Amino acid sequence: YYSKNDSEKFPMNKIFNSFEEAVSDIPDNSTLMIDGFAGPGGTSQNLITALRNLGSKDLTVISNTAGLASVIGFGTLPGKTPVDIGILVENHQIKKVIASFPVSPSPSRPTAFEKAYAKHEVELELVPQGTLAERIRAGGAGIPAFFTPTGVGTTVSEGKEIREFQGKQYVLETALKADYALIRAYKSDKLGNLIYRGTSKNFNSVMVTAAATSIVEVDKIVNIGEIESSLIDTPLIYVDRIVEIKEN
């Protein structure tokens, strides 16, 4: 827990003035973890838009979906355009997606990813959702690999080591790490201690631990000491850059 007088002990300024500035050094061929569950709620929409405008190419994106907001629509405010990683696919910036739910629940409403995948413009690594979360967590914890029974005997286990433990078969899954994580949070203090809200609680807290650089957009930034320590979801050590959303 930090008091307001502790700012002198932490001189590094993590606060950026714009989303464009915060993502400006993301190069081609980067691997990114991008938050969100399905719709745009809890998703770092402003950082994704800034990355689209930056134009970095040949990106590998690790996310729960490959972009469903434009076809599902739930969670999008009236009059707002749905934003998720689908806009990066449309802009031909992604070469590979590692995800659990890459396609639309409705065949009549294909996503940008589905259209690109059908044209062989983007690669897909399909990962069961629980396995995806654990692979990301393992990356942040320094665990190189683990065995899980999920997916044994299916396409997701093809080419992977299978071992038997106590009479049951398990598949070896490797950890996931990223160069950058783009994250949405509700609140941050000036040091980067985060509080999540709603669907931003899902993958965000593990993604920030598994990325070399974590970039966070927040609804509000408060002074040091204004967030009670017991309420902190992600401690400052995992946060590198913070941008406050000026308009909601």
Predicted regions and their residues:
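Short, Lys/Arg-enriched N-terminal segments with co-localized hydrophobic residues
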Residues: 1-11
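Conserved alpha/beta enzyme-core scaffold
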Residues: 10-248
